[in-house]
Amino acid sequence: KWVNTKAIPSDHLLEGIGHVTDRERGVTVAVYGCVVKEVKLRPSVLAEIQKTAGISGTHPAMTSEGYSMTDPYASDEDKIYLEDNSSRIRLVVKDGSSVDLNRLCQGLVLAFKGTRGRGCFEVDDMAFPLPLAPKMIARSDSSDAKYVGFVSGLCLGQESEARSMLAEWITGAAVHKTDTVADPSTMVRLVVAGDTLAGVTTQADLNSVDKFLAQVARSVPVTILPGSQDPANFALPQQPLHSALFPESRKVKDLTAETNPARFQVGDCVFLGSTGACAKEVTQYSTSTDVLDALELTARSRVIAPTAPDTIACYPFPNFDPLVITEDEPVAHVMFSSTHNKAAFRVVDLGDAKLTLLSVSTFVFDPVLLLVNINDPSDIKRINFKASDTFQAEGEDGDTPMDDTS
């Protein structure tokens, strides 16, 4: 990207910058490494102890009555560093540069162009890893459209009229006024992405979950992912929900349990995604507070959970990192994140290819089914299952934003 710019290897980052003499201080160089953020508003155990003991302090969790521990922690007062295997150096934005360092979160491996300052590196530009281009999908006639549906947060331990309407629409048990673009016969798979068993407290509740999944899986293949409120291991990657939870559903061959994060393929279309924690943590620790912005940031940086293991527990793999997106696995056409407040989607241009991003809503709060065409992933439909006698079918002209940005 930066022609005629001296590159300093990350394993000699501070050594290389330290060897720049005062005469060479204004020379532009490129460095790369791992981004580390010193977040001033980050929750602190000591701050909680001080608050409980009534000791005065400066942390907003103690001094601001309106402060919520779910509010974003990122602020303009955060300090951002670039780290190698020996030490770190602070990054500051060079005067006149439009680079926004605050939208970054810790854990991203990026390159920066700039000059050496006094005790810092003055950034003029930054670059993400080169994007991976997914395999081209042969375009077919629009009449051959086949869709994969996405829902999350069904919370089958709670009553929900919208969920019953969803099951009726999938199975064809009831006739409703739907748009032809939302024909249930065009859906070839349903992805239930996390928090399916939220609110389940009794055996009767579990039996209802099993019955619901079996009913749906007899009409369309179902892929189910574990979430933070499901009975699965705490650290990423979460293992598939155990088949013993679903004695009736497991008899249906078309019910598949996946890990979280999950990568799977339907037709020629590859899907990669996780339940909400990965994207939510990015929104907490950067100024990218929109879920789709956070998801795009992780896609461009080629890492699913950049804040792990700092803010998200993850299993320490010694030889490889399953949370890093590499060319060793099929490259995704669609990336999704689930259990969010609202459903949204976006198509981003990565140069040689386009990537579809999905924010899947928690169904009990925002009862929306997102449909992605496996023959054209930029073709996204949504159906809003509100508690009424009709379903609202919305296509690309619906109220969900779809940006085509780079």
PLM regions and their residue ranges:
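Extended recognition/assembly regions associated with phosphoester-bond processing machinery
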Residues: K1-S406
